[in-house]
Amino acid sequence: FKRLRSDKKKEDLAMSAAPADEGDDVAITHPERVVFAKKKLSKGDVADYYRQMARWILPEISERPLSLLRCPDGVGKACFFQKHHGQGLGDAVHAVPLQQKSGREDYVYIDDERGLLQLVQMNTLELHPWGATVADPEHPDRLVFDLDPGEGVSWADVKRGARDVRDRLQETGLQSFVRLSGGKGVHVVVPL
C-alpha cells in the first residue's frame, strides 16, 4: 500500500484478478484412482505434483519430442510407452512430423503446463524428452548419460558413477548437470 487515490472514485476502481495458471482448466477425471499403490498416491496427487513442478519440468521437456510412459491402471499393472501422437491426447498436446525409416510419423510434444496436465490426464507418469528440439530434430543440443542401476547396485554406487561421468566430461571441457530420471537412476546431461 502506498496511498489512497484522490483522482478516482472508489466506484470506478476494481480489483484485478490474479492470472490463472495455464493448466487450471484441465479436468482430471478419476482423481481418486490410486496409481502408486505402495505410496498410496492417486492420479489427483500426480496432477498436483506436476502443477507444482511445471516451472522446473517444462524447460527440460518443452518443444522436444517425447516418449511417454502411460499407466492407465497404475504402476505395477499394464503400462506402455507411446511416442506417436494420437486422438484424444488433448488440444495442447501437439504433433510434429518426423522422418523415420518407414516414412514420416507424428511424434508427441508439448509447450506449456496445459499440455503437461493433459498428458497426466491421459495417465502419463513419465516423460522422456529427446536430446533435440522439434525445431531442429536432426541436430541434438544435449547428450544424456542414463545411469540406470541394475539389481544390487546401491544409490552410493549410482552417485559415484555420476560423479565419474561428470569428471571425465570436465576433462574434455564439457560441463554437465544431473537430474533424476524418474526411476531409480540419474541422467547426466551435457548441453552441446
Task: Please state what every model-predicted region is.
Residues A47, A54, L58, K159-A162, ...:
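Short, well-ordered alpha-helical packing segments
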Residues V26-P137, D141:
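Active-site loop/lid in soluble adenylation, ligation, and acyl-transfer enzymes
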Residues A18-V26, P31, R168, L174:
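Long, charged low-complexity interaction segments
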Residues V108-S181, L192:
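Signature for HUH/AEP ssDNA processing cores
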Residues G76-K77, V189-L192:
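Short, conserved secondary-structure transition motifs
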Residues L66-C71, L174-K184:
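A short glycine-rich, hydrophobically flanked beta-strand micro-motif that places a catalytic Asp/Glu
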Residues F1-D24:
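Intrinsically disordered, low-complexity regulatory tails
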